[in-house]
């Protein structure tokens, strides 16, 4: 069975991590050393060497400050998608706040690439049962794809019973195709296996085994995500507040 998997990237810097949001003020973002250019180019090089096309969910705030990087991602044949503008949890926003943030980021990205932005991913997969209203707003603003619903149980995100396969969601404003990050059903629970911190925690052979099982047994694509800062061996330290955050 020939299954095409999905490699996705959340383009943000190390100090944007949601675990630090109460300790790193947005007004101070520009005071931190930026690592996003070098790390994203390192990732672009890896993808090019292996002939992989990816979807890059770019933070609007970053796109304003590194427009050449967004153009380079686009010029190298990758899809440029939206990660919002301010890196705020969706369920901490009012619907019209979310819409304004969505439009602001989309307009910046479309101006830089000359192409319509069709896909969106929320910070920390924060479209949960509390914020399903965001799906209708996405559809009403012309988005066709979303990757914000994580079918797991987590203190910050997740809808444990959500469909783990790529599927269509019908909203009053039109349809969206949802691309959940991959999970494996183990001991009656959905276990996240599709990248991010989970990729760093698990041995590589486990991830490869799960990828193969999702492709072969379930016949569906493996949806993987990574942040550029996760490839940085010299990442500056931000005062982590707990061992789990670190």
What are these regions (language model features)?
Residues 8-11, 81, 121, 225:
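Generic enzyme active-site microenvironment
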Residues 50-131, 143, 148-153, 174-175, ...:
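Metal-dependent polysaccharide deacetylase catalytic core of the NodB/CE4 family, i.e.
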Residues 33, 37, 95-103, 204:
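Non-membrane alpha-helical structural segments and their capping/turn regions in soluble enzymes
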Residues 1-79:
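Active-site beta->alpha N-cap acidic-glycine motif
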């Amino acid at each position: 069975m020939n299954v095409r998997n999905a490699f996705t990237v959340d383009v943000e810097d190390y100090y944007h991590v949601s675990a630090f949001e109460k300790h790193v003020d947005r007004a101070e973002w520009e005071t931190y050393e930026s690592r996003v250019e070098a790390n994203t180019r390192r990732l672009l090089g890896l993808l090019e060497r292996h002939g992989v096309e990816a979807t890059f969910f770019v933070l609007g705030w970053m796109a304003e400050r590194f427009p050449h990087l967004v153009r380079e991602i686009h010029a190298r044949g990758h899809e440029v998608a939206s990660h919002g503008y301010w890196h705020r949890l969706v369920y901490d926003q009012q619907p019209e706040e979310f819409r304004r943030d969505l439009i602001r980021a989309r307009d910046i990205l479309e101006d830089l690439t000359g192409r319509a932005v069709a896909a969106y991913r929320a910070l920390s997969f924060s479209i949960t049962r509390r914020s399903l209203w965001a799906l209708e707003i996405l559809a009403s603003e012309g988005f066709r794809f979303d990757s914000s619903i994580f079918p797991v149980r987590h203190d910050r995100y997740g809808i444990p019973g959500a469909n783990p396969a790529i599927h269509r969601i019908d909203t009053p404003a039109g349809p969206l195709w949802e691309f959940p990050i991959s999970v494996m059903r183990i001991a009656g629970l959905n276990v996240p296996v599709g990248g991010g911190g989970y990729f760093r925690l698990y041995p590589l052979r486990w991830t490869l085994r799960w990828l193969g099982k999702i492709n072969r047994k379930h016949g569906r694509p493996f949806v993987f995500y990574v942040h550029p800062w996760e490839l940085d061996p010299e990442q500056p330290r931000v005062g982590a507040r707990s061992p789990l955050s670190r």
